[in-house]
Amino acid sequence: MTRIALALALVASLFTLPVQAQNAAALTAALASAEGRPAADKEADARRKPAETLDFFGIGPGMTVVDLIASGGYYTEVLANAVGPNGKVYMQNAPSALTGERGTRTEQAINDRLAGGRLANVERLNRDPHDLGLPDGSLDAAVIALEYHELYRNADPQTEARFLAEMKRVLKSGGVLGVIDHAGNAGNDNGPMHRAELDKVLAGAAAAGFIVDGTSDLLRNPADDRSLTVFDASIRGVTDQFIVKLRKP
């Protein structure tokens, strides 16, 4: 690298980091002041760091994205604010997740969140995550938050492979699959604890043809030794979590 090129690269880095920080700060402020956003969501932001997480994934205005296994839609609303009025968010939940007592609660939470058309750029997608029914190459990004481990809690050993194949189909070239999950230890039976092993996620992604574009320690918590279920009162909400940015070639 020539001296001029090196100097330009250094200057660019000086501008890039503040801009990223500004983007995250702006989204944080927007989420805090969002009218009608649940108070519990706003309280959770400090520990979940959604603005910084989406900044790491590179998700921004005008993008078309999907919130996978969205449940009541915490990240759906975060994404809706991040992509803005010129973007679009699909809120995906499997039909089976919207039945029974728990499903009824989820459905009510969704209806409350979307009431009055307050998230006009959000469209519900009640389909299985391995069969989204969206056009090929139609998404800029997909986010699966604290749910990737569910791909392993399934009798079908091909569940993860089918999911990743669908992600490759619907993402544009260069599109991002962002994964956030509770970290598990190698050798543990992580399924019952609702955890996932980072190396296992990375191996599955590589086998499916994704590029690992980076990992983040933003949500790491060394005080969690990963031996307890994520619902244990001593660590609920503050588990050790990994963040992975996967990219479709």
Regions found by a protein language model. Give the residues of each.
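A short acidic, Gly/Pro-enriched loop at the edge of an enzyme's catalytic core
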Residues: M63, L132-V143
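Conserved beta-strand signature within the Rossmann-like core of class I S-adenosyl-L-methionine
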Residues: G174-A183
